[in-house]
Amino acid sequence: MRDDLPEIIHMGREKDYIFQLNTNGIRLAREEGYAGKLKKAGLNTVFLQFDGVTDQVYETLRGQAMMELKKKAVLNCSEAELGIALVPVIAPGVNDMQVGNILKFGLDHMLCSWRTFSAYQLFWQMFQKRPQNPITIPKMLRLIEEQTEGLMKIEDFAGGGAENPYCSFHASYLRKGERELKLLEKKSGKGCCCTTSDDSRQYVENQWSYSTKTYDEGEMTQTDALDEFLIRIHNETFAVSGMIFQDAWNLDLDRLKRCYICEVDPDHGMVPFCAYNLTNLKGIYLYRK
């Protein structure tokens, strides 16, 4: 990561921008105090690349052993009170057998630093050859239910609301005890988009940021009950979401028409994310330069 990142975040926050940092976590793990600098500058959330729980997965996907670095990055972010979202790339035959263990790591992390909002997202890498065993939403949901031993069930999940429902899935849970989750109301079709810009920014910031509000024993009053419940909802919510990106083998124009994750291109305007990253069979981008 660039050395002036804290300064960039600080300047952006002065203009009311919200920052979510996508990172492999190496610098966050190795440089003590760096997470704190980013937090002080105004960073809201770290989206941490987290492909599995063994070094073998990282050696295959990233070219080096990284599990200890991931653990250290999570620890440093938690100590700096930065919200954390775990973001794995799920590849068939590489780490699809570790989906449950990744979720378990997220839940265990909440137990150690329970005010951290943890999320889980799944992305499918693009292949130059037609994949024989592609990751699909039904397959991912089956893996989640099987590998969590029913802690999270297929029927818990809803499709996307703003985007095409075949593009993503999500569910939110409230932690109850060490290994019990209560499914929260499904919110398919609901979100922060159809409102003012200020309200949308506040929604995103509240959704992903670390919460520091707690009640000490004996501090509660009867009038605090609702506030305490709302704080618990924020502090102990565990969200699981996934997005299956399209490639040359399954590109669907109807899905692209509803895409709201776009790249701004000087030649092509607003290009849907999947189309922007689309390549031909020789690996040459069609829109991205």
Question: Which role does the model predict for each range below?
Answer:
Residues 204-267, 275:
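Basic, glycine-rich polyanion-binding accessory segments appended to enzymes
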Residues 79-234:
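Radical SAM enzyme [4Fe-4S]-AdoMet core and its adjacent flexible, acidic
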